[in-house]
């Protein structure tokens, strides 16, 4: 279980309140698919994923990215119980979708990059450390159901 200090929680919640979920979600998923092209195999029904510009402009990528980042909001609300908050998604990704759990870590790291680009100087090393801790905790929670 990940333990967050009161300061880390406040830091995460403060920044989360400023995140444009639709924009950042689409960017995060898009970057994941571009930088780690083997992840595209889970999205074969998304249409044209042939180039970086096609991926970043793909409406299905943007919509699913928003969905992913919206569910990430559950992590912000449930920092003290990430495993419980992501139990159903862990089961879905393990048993039905068969997603390699390493992809959760990759997506978390991409999210940190997106937040850094969106918030610039406001994304200090302390802010990054808190967010890195959160995305790592989410990746671990999502991988929980894997055998």
UniProtKB/Swiss-Prot annotation:
The keyword Heme applies. It comes from the Eukaryota. Residues 3-147 form the Globin domain. The modification Phosphoserine is found at residues 14, 51. Heme b binds at residues 64, 93. The keyword DNA-binding does not apply. GO terms for cellular component: blood microparticle; haptoglobin-hemoglobin complex; hemoglobin complex. Red blood cells. Keywords: Heme, Iron, Metal-binding, Oxygen transport, Phosphoprotein, Transport. SUPFAM superfamilies: Globin-like. Belongs to the globin family. The epsilon chain is a beta-type chain of early mammalian embryonic hemoglobin. PANTHER family: HEMOGLOBIN FAMILY MEMBER, HEMOGLOBIN SUBUNIT EPSILON. This is Hemoglobin subunit epsilon. It comes from Daubentonia madagascariensis (Aye-aye). The gene is HBE1.
């Amino acid at each position: 279980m990940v333990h967050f200090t009161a300061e880390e929680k406040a830091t995460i919640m403060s920044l989360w309140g400023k995140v444009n979920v639709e924009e950042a979600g689409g960017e995060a998923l898009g970057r994941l698919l571009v930088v780690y092209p083997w992840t595209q195999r889970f999205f074969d029904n998304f249409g044209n994923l042939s180039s970086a510009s096609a991926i970043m402009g793909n409406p299905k990528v943007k919509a699913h990215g928003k969905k992913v980042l919206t569910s990430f909001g559950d992590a912000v609300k449930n920092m003290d119980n990430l495993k419980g908050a992501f139990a159903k998604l862990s089961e879905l990704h393990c048993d039905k979708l068969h997603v390699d759990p390493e992809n959760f870590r990759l997506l978390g790291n991409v999210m940190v990059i997106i937040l850094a680009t969106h918030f610039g100087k406001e994304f200090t090393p302390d802010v990054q450390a808190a967010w890195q801790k959160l995305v790592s905790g989410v990746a671990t929670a999502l991988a929980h159901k894997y055998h």
